[in-house]
């Protein structure tokens, strides 16, 4: 069904400080089930490059080139990160300024691995946390390409389970996931209790 939903307008909200809107029109959604990464458990696409509007505050620590970052908040206008705050703000902005594509998003992915529930500062695991999604400044993958090119690809994770503040993901006007659990009948099989 995630393939069927491609072409939708996305809206993501959470109580602590995220309100994002973007389009994924004409960009494929890619199912990840162990062909490229182990562990796996995500479906990814990319936003139309200039479509991202709003703000997001990540609640999982992220490790990038040996530096741990906390409480990153990004603000977007016409797809571009116009403000980035958090721990080590100078280094954060320096990384995003690596090149022109560093301030645009190259990936959006919904994660659902039932065996990964807490961040561990290893992005191959953290990006699969059940009830999370990641939003990635930098380079887009060729198989879900929005045209953004960059030397960086920095997966940043927001966990939407109730113990992390909750949140909602909407495709068009349909609530798809609430507080980390899929609420659309066709996607309920991806909830942790159905995958274990």
Question: Where are the regions that the model predicts?
Answer:
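N-terminal small-residue-enriched
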Residues: 13, 18-196
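Single conserved hydrophobic/aromatic residue that forms the stacking wall/gate
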Residues: 1-7, 11-12
